[in-house]
Every structure is written in C-alpha cells, then in structure tokens.
Amino acid sequence: MAVISMKQLLEAGVHFGHQTRRWNPKMAPYIFTERNGIYIIDLQKTVRKVDEAYNFIREVATQGKKILFVGTKKQAQDSVKEEAERCGMYYVNQRWLGGMLTNFQTIQKRISRLRELEKMEADGTFEVLPKKEVSKLLHEKEKLERFLGGIKDMKELPGAIFVIDPRKERIAVAEARRLGIPLVGIVDTNCDPDEIDYVIPGNDDAIRAVKLLTAKMADAVLEGNQGQSDAQ
C-alpha cells in the first residue's frame, strides 16, 4: 500500500511543473506531458518515489540518526518549521549560511553564543545592563535565532537531509554531497535530479504541494522513531 495516493497528489497540485522553457532535460523521465506551456509531472512515478523516500527516511530515524529539513523559499518556510518540529528534527528555513555542514565547528560557536544570550535574558543579566547594550544584545539574539534556531540542538551532522528545491538550496546540496550525507528532495522540472539520492518529482512552488510532501517525510521520521523505541 503506497504511503500517498494519486488523489492526494492531484488535489495538492503536485503534478504542475515549471514552464517548458525553464526545464532540465534530465527530468524528462518524470514528465508525463505538456499542457499550456507547462510540464505535467508523472504522478505514478511520484507515488513510487515518495514510497522510496519514505522508507529511506524511516530507516534513518530507526537507526537513531537525525534528519535536517531544508527549505528557505517563501512557499516552504512554514511547512519546514512546522513539520520538522512535529517530528522532533532540525530545520533551516531562513537562509543557508555557507559552512553550516562543512564548517560545523564554527557554526557550533555561533550556537553557543545564542545559548549564552538566551541564558543572560533568562537569568536577569539584561535587567542590570544599560538599555542601549540590551537592545544591541537582543538584536544579536534575534538574528542568531532566526538563522540557527532550527539547528541549535544539533550536536553532530545529520544522517540525511530533506531539501525542497535543490536548485535554490544548491549550497546545502553541495555541502551534503561533499560530506557524503544522503539527500532526499522535492525536485521540480527545472532541477537536476542527479544531485539527489532520493528524488521526489513534484511541484516545489505551491504551498499545498510542499506541505503534503514535507508532512509525509515527517510521518516517516515518527514511524522510524517508533520503530527505534520498539526495538529498545
């Protein structure tokens, strides 16, 4: 039994690709037809590919490894945060800071600074500092929280990365590939599927499509976590 149905995919508009003039020929195997200058994705293939990605993510979670959800485009930001939080995983939904994976130690220092500022705010240190100083520190904290809030508990590199639109997230994809971290991704008709280990052919521009597919990956994590606790 497939984890997602054609009906769900159709209702969410997962089948709408990009305009035909903006395409990557490597996506040809996943294209069903062309309609009014737009490529239509073959949803039978998407159903199979979602199954493969789901099984892989579930397996990673069963092994106790973490998954990093990445989607910084407007249409993905809310879904990425909500679904990653729902399954207790990490996320980046604002901007990918170069080196988030390849320069992990430096990023850890920035996270330590964020924790330090949070502690200062919680233990009353801010109350005894001059207003101007506090305002500066709060601004610094907000900025760090915005970019690093979703990975502040990440102590080691993730076991896999789920990415929405590998073209937009090309720096994240390049870093993951360099480190040999497996990639699962929603890949639209204008992307290069060769960069992604588990390709989910689908619309990466519609909020409903992104939400549906991201939620499925979060479900896979939850099922994998359940499998891990059952095994213990």
Swiss-Prot record:
It comes from the Bacteria. GO terms for biological process: translation. Pfam families: Ribosomal_S2 (PF00318). CDD domains: RPS2 (cd01425). One of its GO terms (cellular component) is cytosolic small ribosomal subunit. SUPFAM superfamilies: Ribosomal protein S2. Gene3D superfamilies: Glucose-6-phosphate isomerase like protein, domain 1, Helix hairpin bin. Keywords: Ribonucleoprotein, Ribosomal protein. One of its GO terms (molecular function) is structural constituent of ribosome. Belongs to the universal ribosomal protein uS2 family. PANTHER family: 30S RIBOSOMAL PROTEIN S2 PROKARYOTIC AND ORGANELLAR, SMALL RIBOSOMAL SUBUNIT PROTEIN US2M. This is Small ribosomal subunit protein uS2. The gene is rpsB.
